[in-house]
Amino acid sequence: MEKIIIKLEKRSYPIIIADKLFNDFLPFWPLNIDDKVVLITNDRVAPIYLNILRNLLIRSGIVTDQLILPDGEQNKSLITLDTIFTKLLKKNYDRSTILIGLGGGVIGDITGFAAATYQRGIRFIQVPTTLLAQVDASIGGKTGINHILGKNMIGAFHQPIAVIINLDVLHTLSMKEFSSGLAEIIKYAIALDSSFFGWLESHLDDLLILHLPSLMYCIRRCCELKASIIAIDERDQGIRSVLNLGHTYGHAIESYLGYSQWSHGESIAAGIMMAVNTALRLNQFNCSDAKRIKLLLTRAGLPVRGPKEMTSKNYLEYMKRDKKSISGQLNLVLPTSTIGNVKTVFNVNHELVSLSIEDTNN
């Protein structure tokens, strides 16, 4: 078992990584007898894990309720959020209640946002069931919902009291879902750790066959990298922006397609290549590393081009609404020099971005 602490003074919390974490109630669960818990999950995860986790909690003396939501990024919405609030209010849950988000990034984001806003803030625990959520979405306190005009435009920073990462759940993922998580893993390496990128080049095949020691190391390394950034910049006002590599382009893809056709990881993978090509046009990155990135994404089963139906104009319409953009100026996180280094480039020329998107898609 691995334990990583997110260091945020009084709001510090543990990330626990191990297999078989749903078998026994272990002391690292930050719950006490008679705590009131509401398990929030979706209709894909519920048939596999809901009863297992709920029965574990009940056997341990935890008062446990449940709420099953529809699956899908398109359901990360105000309507679904209201469903959670209605459940909590009808059952008279008070501020001592603890929510547990059992699912992927969508469940984690919306459960966290419900916790951030219900009665001005209650506690919650993240139990991520996808690789993407385990290495990224469940960590760091970003919570929120989508709007038809943009992804994650409504949200709050609200840290969980724990993140419980059970490696066993990865065996139930499709290859598409697993590859989606690999996009965020590759992002960490490009942005922060060239040695980790080299490790991924050597061990990607081990990850694809779910080799447990490789998974443990990989997920732990991603959590360590993100923890180091969050400890410095919890609210995304400085260095945390490096974690947005590829996301301005990728969020444009998701928004344009209505959050239903491409997964988050697929969108980010294409977005990473667009960021790489933008950096090449700015003469701040090298072709050799660009080829390594493209090859690793391809080996991971991820797209290295955007959707055929999107034009560069479509991208720019959404990218100008990005949270990092100001007054229509495009502020983009781009690779610089070599793998392991990125920086925010401010007011990037729109025409250059359009050409970079075309470079990627041709």
Swiss-Prot record:
Gene3D superfamilies: 3.40.50.1970, Dehydroquinate synthase-like - alpha domain. One of its GO terms (cellular component) is cytoplasm. Pathway: Metabolic intermediate biosynthesis; chorismate biosynthesis; chorismate from D-erythrose 4-phosphate and phosphoenolpyruvate: step 2/7. Zn(2+) binds at residues 184, 247, 264. It catalyses: 7-phospho-2-dehydro-3-deoxy-D-arabino-heptonate = 3-dehydroquinate + phosphate. One of its GO terms (molecular function) is metal ion binding. Keywords: Amino-acid biosynthesis, Aromatic amino acid biosynthesis, Cobalt, Cytoplasm, Lyase, Metal-binding, NAD, Nucleotide-binding, Zinc. Its main location: cytoplasm. Its EC number is 4.2.3.4. Binds 1 divalent metal cation per subunit. Can use either Co(2+) or Zn(2+). InterPro entries: Dehydroquinate_synthase, DHQ_synth_AroB, DHQ_synth_fam, DHQS/DOIS_N, DHQS_C. It comes from the Bacteria. Its cofactor is Co(2+); Zn(2+); NAD(+). One of its GO terms (biological process) is amino acid biosynthetic process. NAD(+) binds at residues 71-76, 105-109, 129-130, 142, 151. It is found in: Cytoplasm. Belongs to the sugar phosphate cyclases superfamily. Dehydroquinate synthase family. Catalyzes the conversion of 3-deoxy-D-arabino-heptulosonate 7-phosphate (DAHP) to dehydroquinate (DHQ). This is 3-dehydroquinate synthase. It comes from Blochmanniella pennsylvanica (strain BPEN).
